[in-house]
From Swiss-Prot:
Name of the protein this chain belongs to: NADH-quinone oxidoreductase subunit B
InterPro entries membership: NADH_UbQ_OxRdtase-like_20kDa (IPR006137), NADH_UQ_OxRdtase_20Kd_su (IPR006138)
Mode of membrane association: Peripheral membrane protein
Record function comment: NDH-1 shuttles electrons from NADH, via FMN and iron-sulfur (Fe-S) centers, to quinones in the respiratory chain. Couples the redox reaction to proton translocation (for every two electrons transferred, four hydrogen ions are translocated across the cytoplasmic membrane), and thus conserves the redox energy in a proton gradient.
Lineage: Bacteria, Pseudomonadati, Pseudomonadota, Betaproteobacteria, Nitrosomonadales
Location (main, coarse): membrane
One Pfam family cited in the UniProt record for this chain: Oxidored_q6
Cofactor remark from the record: Binds 1 [4Fe-4S] cluster.
EC main group: translocase
Gene name as annotated: nuoB
Record bears the keyword Nucleus: no
């Protein structure tokens, strides 16, 4: 947390934005939206070796309990309305991580008539994690980048 100033009497001054964003980065609750093989790597990231719980990241089963959606895998046209519906059920503020080449831009199945060429056509994406499939380390790096993005945002309307 960045502290803007320390007064000589022992007081610490900072902005409310900084405090709110700092607390949000320590308690991200992602909802898994696993569609294909990238979901296995997402489960790998939540297992004992990488243990996302140590960063305050706890996977939630319901969109109403989560604030981050990780879209992992090939998004087809039939699943696109369900993705948008689940995204709309999430509480504000909400963020989206697109994991893997298929979620980012269609991947190997890019030219198929049934594939959406990137989940960013359906929901706004904050962080893209490349790879086919991306490793658990890449997902962890993407989550850290999302935390850095959250720290830089202004939360209070001026």
């Amino acid at each position: 947390m960045s502290i803007e100033g320390v007064l000589e009497k022992g007081f610490v001054t900072t902005t409310l934005d900084t405090v709110i964003n700092y607390t949000r980065t320590g308690s991200l609750w992602p909802m898994t939206f696993g569609l294909a093989c990238c979901a296995v790597e997402m489960m790998h990231a939540g297992a004992a070796r990488y243990d996302l719980d140590r960063f305050g990241i706890v996977f939630r089963p319901s969109p109403r309990q989560s604030d981050v959606m990780i879209v992992a895998g090939t998004l087809v046209n039939k699943m696109a309305p369900a993705l948008r519906k689940v995204y709309d059920q999430m509480a504000e503020p909400r963020w989206v991580i697109s994991m893997g080449s298929c979620a980012n831009g269609g991947g190997y199945y890019h030219y198929s008539y049934a594939v959406v060429r990137g989940c960013d056509r359906i929901v706004p994406v904050d962080v893209y994690v490349p790879g086919c499939p991306p490793t658990a380390e890449a997902l962890l790096y993407g989550i850290i980048q999302l935390q850095n993005k959250i720290k830089r945002t202004n939360t209070i309307a001026r």
